[in-house]
A protein has these predicted regions:
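N-terminal single-pass transmembrane signal-anchor helix
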Residues: 1-35
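Periplasmic/extracellular, small/polar-rich flexible segments of pilin-like filament-forming proteins
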Residues: 59-132
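Amphipathic alpha-helical interface surfaces
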Residues: 27, 39-42, 46, 78, ...
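Membrane-proximal N-terminal amphipathic helix
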Residues: 37-64
Length: 132
């Protein structure tokens, strides 16, 4: 008595592998675009966090009459100091362009530039000079 055939033939397996490869090749450009979009979004969120940290520090400095008080008011004289205001610091792979913030400008906001070292993309955030 002949046994009924079980499983897949070699031709069916090759066809399935070829279709899987074609689907993967078609999806690859979409995944690359997704990575670029994720990098840009991460940069924007980090710039927003830096701006929020600067604004909170400025509010603490207003309460302490621009005197440095640990946990409330950090003296900010350069844009690149924003890392001290972020809880975990500035993440690896990002940097803030150094830009002096003169003490006489206290109370006026200015724009600082955050850069992604891997893509070269940049985003700006508002900074507030603080301290005596």
């Amino acid at each position: 008595m002949p046994r009924p055939a079980r499983g897949f033939t070699l031709i069916e397996q090759i066809a399935a592998i070829a279709l899987s490869g074609a689907a993967a090749a078609a999806a690859l450009p979409a995944l690359a675009a997704l990575q670029a979009q994720a990098d840009a979004t991460a940069l924007q969120h980090l710039a927003s966090a830096a701006g929020s940290a600067m604004a909170l520090n400025y509010a603490g400095c207003l309460v302490s009459n621009q005197a440095a008080v640990p946990g409330k008011c950090q003296v900010m004289a350069n844009c690149s100091q924003v890392g001290m205001l972020l809880q975990a610091g500035l993440p690896a792979g990002y940097r803030v362009l150094p830009q002096a913030m003169p003490a006489q400008a206290a109370g006026r906001d200015m724009s600082c530039q955050l850069l992604d070292n891997t893509t070269g993309a940049g985003a700006s955030f508002r900074a507030y000079p603080t301290g005596a």
